């Protein structure tokens, strides 16, 4: 068990308007290669669907610790001290160019989720995946600027 230090925001790196299911994410992450990554656990705690609904992928006890059964594989080197959330989207229609494709419903759901999370865990840094791995464009939007726009200063 480790202290929770980060909430990482991710995108699924799928085209704008393409819904993603929990089953797809499980297949991408837990199926053996070459179909998936062969991980024991999916990479995200919660999935933000296009309609703004939020689906829990990995249960957790919502405290300030990351227990072994709560660890998700969203960012190498940070998983034991992080929770990871993901929105469906993140790529332009060409399927290659990073783009903030969040729907209005996803933006509102993520805003509510992050504000609630920050209220319960004010010591936790909320970051985009690319802030911890510069090789990534994920989540395809400027998380620090967005946090400031919703009233969170870190």
Sequence positions of predicted segments:
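Short amphipathic alpha-helices and their capping/turn segments at secondary-structure boundaries
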Residues: 63, 68-77
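Basic/polar, cationic surfaces and motifs that engage anionic cell-wall
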Residues: 1-12, 50-54, 58-60, 76-83, ...
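Generic structural signal for short, flexible, solvent-exposed coil/loop and linker residues
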Residues: 35-37, 43, 72-74, 115, ...
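Surface-exposed beta-strand edges and their flanking turn/coil or helix-capping segments
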Residues: 21-24, 69-72, 100, 141
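Short, flexible coil/turn micro-motifs enriched in small/turn-prone residues
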Residues: 47, 69-72, 123
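Short, conserved "active-site rim" segments that organize catalytic pockets and cofactor/ligand binding
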Residues: 1-67
